[in-house]
Amino acid sequence: MSDFEDNVPDDLEGRGYEEREEEGLDSFDSSVRIEISRLSLFTHHGVTDAEQEAGQRLVFDIAFEVEDCDATVTDRVEDTVDYGAVCQAVALIATERSYRTLERLCTAVADMIEERFRAANVIVRATKPEPPIPLPVEEVSVEVER
């Protein structure tokens, strides 16, 4: 046994997944917050037709909660949300059609994450690193919360 294991109090030892299943306990009542930072995609969104045709890079920051996340105990990927699948789904929404506003795009992404991944407290931020504004602006962002 390691020094760490020797110092763990007995009352911190948890029951395993199998023991909880035998007792009829379906979940571990543990929620987790998942954050995806700086997902960069080339898209065709914008107010003007020219902006949509030329396309531009958008950067997404996404956060959401997964209620009753059994993976906190089971360590099984199938007991949580696959982050890669979330990124692929966001990429599909962001590239399959054009939106005039970032507000609508962020809403579409947030709605999809809520529905497809059964997530709660979803926050989606889309950032235009080089907005077509004739003033010295580094970036613009829109954030939608669900």
Predicted regions and their residues:
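N-terminal, polar/charged subdomain of small-to-medium soluble alpha/beta proteins
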Residues: 2-146
